[in-house]
Structures are given as C-alpha cells and as structure tokens.
C-alpha cells in the first residue's frame, strides 16, 4: 500500500484545503457551540458519495464511505477528528487569525481539514480500496464531553461496527514529522472539585468560625506530598491544583472554600491510588480543623488513558515508515488527555484493543531547528493552547492527510494501491 499512497494523494484535488482551513481558523467555536463549523463540514461532505449523519450528540457528524459489498468481510475503519476551539485570544498575527476572542489553539481546524482530505481521497480513488471507512467529526473534545455525547445519542447503533479506531493530533515538532508508538500514549485525566463546608463569621472573631480558607490551604499543601511520597518513582502521576477560591469580602470569614484538582496517570491502578489518597487527605484535614460537615467531592471531565494497540501499531507503523522515512519517529508519552478513547471503549474489550492515536509535528522546520540548536525548545516554540500556536500549514496538512490515508489504506487498500 505504502509505495503508492503519495501518488494516490497527489492525484486527488485537495486545492480547497487551504481556503477551508483558513475559514475554520478564522471562525473558532467553543465546545458544544460548533454549529457554523459543522455546517461547513457538512457542505464539503456533500461533494462526496457518502452517507452523512449530522447532529449526533450536538454537532457531531459521521460520513460513511462504503466500497464493495457490505456483506463481505472487508475491514471497517473509523478515523476521528475533533472540531472545537478554545477560549484563547489569538496573537499569531496571521491575516486569517480569529478576532472573536476564541481560537483554534489546539489544531482541531487542521484535524478536520485533513480528515476531509481523506474523504476526498476515498471518493476519488474507489478503485484503490475496498471496505467501509467512517469519518467522524467530534465536537466538544476540549471539555471532555463530545465523545460521550455522541455515544449517548446512539452513535454505536447508527454506524457500522468498526474493526479499527484511529485518530491523530498536531503537536509542536518539525512540521511533517509523524510520531507514533504502542502502549500508553496519552494520560488518563480526572478533575476533582472539593468543597470544604466551614462556618462563617466576622473577620474580627475567627474563634467563632470554622475557617474553610485555612483548611483549603492545608489541603493544597498536603496534596503536594501525595505523588512524591505515595506513588512509586517508577510510576507517573500528576496532581495539580488549578482552582482555589474562598470568600468575597475582607472582613468576612467565608462559609465555604472550593478547590479543583486535575490529575493525570498512565495506569488505572495508579489512578485509583491517587484519587483515594486525595480523598483521604481532604477528609483528614477537615477533621483536624474541626469541620463537622462532610466535604463535597465531585469527579468530572474524566478522560480514559489512551493506550495504543500493539496489533494496530504493528500494521500502521510500517506504512508511516515507508511513506515518511526518517520523518516517521517514535512518539513519547504525553501528559495531555483525550476523550477519543471513549469511542472504542464503547465496543468492549475488542474496541479497547483496536485503536491507534498518533501525532504530527506542525512547527516550521527552520524555527524548530534554530530553537533546538539554541537549547530553547521549551521556552520559544509555541505550544498547543497558546495564543501564538500556528501550524505551518502546507507541510502539516499534507502530513496529516497522508498519515490518515496511509493508516486507513493499511486496512482497506487493495492490491497495487
């Protein structure tokens, strides 16, 4: 398959990708609000012979491409792209930059453009493949709700059962380089909201209060010791306090304090140990300060660990190596998290063991090489979720499109494709 995938891509008219990408980039929409974005995707899909189903779980879309007799044992492959943006003010200075206070600061505009490119390739080259390919455009990835929303809206019953689940994401790195690995690739994530219920009083009479601010401060300090003292050094865990708030007046001891903790792990047993330790610390600090009310502990925005299938990796990675050569490299584990894995997990153990998630570098190569030579990669290269994050379009969209086609054709490509 790999020997001619570039020829297949190059024979397909993808000249529309630049204008499409510029349009999405200049009109970013937040999680759950992707109405205009979804409309542009549906309009582009209208050019292809596919079954399109929209408004799944909000603004989710699937396009089902079938080639051959569905009764045959040909493979069914699902490839997903996320489509939502972030509440980030863009500072790239690009002439197509967003001006609405939101931004495609995580590259979802690139993901959608590349997946539509794959759709064009499938439609224009039906003599080169056989099977079923599902292009899934997912809303609300950034808040962790989109995949579950599509599943809750009946996704499994509305599409053919996939044999393989694929996704990709752009990251800082030399534009056009593809990074892949087997095993744990993205961390699992939990957000934990903790509310300490104290007793309010006048600021001049702290002895009549149960001060939740003090308790919350002690909790934050104690949380810092969990990873260093309870998680083995050979394991990975992060527990970061992202929110700490209490009170609104200088002379009132408040009745409540709120803490939000974000946790990341690569292993389910470590996750359970970390979460249990957090709950233990919260309750113990409340007890130590005489808090009589049970603290409120709420888990939300859970993202499962992204664990790449060894079998799928073994089939797709040789295609990447053949097409990209030295530009196909080993990925490292990332501490970021994703909700994509909820989709294969909805199909049980078979789905859980049949997914692959890879990365594509998007930084201008000269910028990356200069920063590497100066030893300033972590300080000077714009990263995802930054207002300065701007992919180098041409090499990035080409690599994303070719990587998508290579991975899909590894399963549905016919002899000589």
State what each model feature region is.
Residues 2-104, 109-117, 121-130:
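Acidic/His- and Gly-rich active-site-bordering loop/insert found
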Residues 24, 63, 79, 108, ...:
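Divalent metal-coordination and catalytic microenvironments
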Residues 29, 82-84, 140, 171, ...:
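Active-site beta-loop-alpha junctions enriched in small/polar residues
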Residues 62-64, 193, 357:
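Conserved hydrophobic/aromatic beta-strand scaffold that supports enzyme active sites
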Residues 74-75, 161-163, 353:
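Local beta-strand N-terminus motif with an aromatic residue
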Residues 86-88, 93-103, 109-110, 127-243, ...:
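Histidine/acidic-residue-rich, glycine-tolerant segments that coordinate divalent metal ions
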Residues 214-417:
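Metal-dependent amide/peptide-bond hydrolase catalytic core
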